[in-house]
Amino acid sequence: MEQVPVAPEFTHPAVEEIELAAVLHALSDPQRLRIVRELAANAEPLACGSFALDVGKSTRTHHFRVLREAGLIEQRRDGTRKLSVLRREDLDTRFPGLLDAVLSA
C-alpha cells in the first residue's frame, strides 16, 4: 500500500518562551496587525484564506508563520484549511495589557 505524505504539525512556543521582541516585531507589520485585529474580533478560529489581504499566497504564509512563531496565534489543520486563533490568554499571562494596548491604538 502506498503511503500518503502527512504535512507536519505546527509548532508553537510555550507561554514562557514567548519573547517581547518577537511579539513586537510581528505586530510591526500592517498586514500582520490586521490579521491579529481580525482574530481578536472573532471568537472562532478563522481560515487563513478568509482574510482580505492584498498579498500573494507565499507572502500570506510568511505572515502567518511570523505570527505563529512569535506566539501570537495558534494554528491547526482542518482538512485542507489552516485555522488560526489568537492566543489572547497566553499573551495576557505573559505580557499583561500589551495586546489590549496594541489593539486599541
PLM segments and residue spans:
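Conserved acidic functional residues
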Residues: 29, 63, 96
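Generic N-terminal simple sequence motifs
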Residues: 1-4, 92
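N-terminal helix-turn-helix DNA-binding core of bacterial DNA-binding proteins
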Residues: 21-56, 78-90
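Conserved segment of winged-helix/HTH DNA-binding domains
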Residues: 16-20, 83-105
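Canonical helix-turn-helix DNA-binding module
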Residues: 49-72
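Short, Lys/Arg-enriched N-terminal segment that forms or immediately precedes the first helix
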Residues: 3-24
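Short beta-strand "wing" residues that participate in macromolecule-binding interfaces
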Residues: 75
